Amino acid sequence: MKGLLLKDAYQAWYYAKMVVVAAVVMMGVGVISMMNGANFFIVYAGFLLGMMPMTLLAYDQTSKFNEYSAALPATKEQLVGCKYIVGLCGLVLAEAFAAAALGVAQLHWVAVDSALVISTLVQVGMTTLLSSTILLPLSYRFGYEKAKVGFYFIVGALSALMGFSVAANEDGLVRNLLPQSISSLGLLSIAVVVLTLYALSWRLSVAWYGRAEQ
């Protein structure tokens, strides 16, 4: 298990560095947009970081590592679990970047209050895990190339939400993916549901592991 995680860590550093750079740039833009309470760029940066497990799985399937791994002393749960651990690492990274960006924004903009900060952090976590929750099982079942259709659907859904948000605001700014009136209990419920779906997604990926090669 440790060796698998080290392999994924090396690949993430080698192949996904630009994703981290892009996320940092998005966070920087998000600090500026937060002057009007618009957190879309910070949330979307989390979505980018959440794509790292999919990127690593794509390289595994392209290089036939999934076939070679049959000779390793590792179970399906461990092989699949590594990608989900990478997803959780992406979540921690996204939340850390978002907290830093929100801290800077809170120092400069009156519109950034504690309620908006908490709501934004929940939204970052939700979008960071969203892509892995949906796309990893599809990739293990149908292969990365076919699962990319799901990726395009998610991007389209986020774009649609962005369009609705723009239409709902007179100043044409994208504000929040979630209603600003949602309660703390509602945000906690969303966080619990997202983590539960992430765990169920792992079980589904384990069940479908190896199907894409058949």
Show where each model-derived region lies.
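Hydrophobic alpha-helical transmembrane segments of membrane proteins
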Residues: 1-64, 82-214
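Alpha-helix N-cap/helix-start motif at helix boundaries, enriched for small hydrophobics
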Residues: 78-80
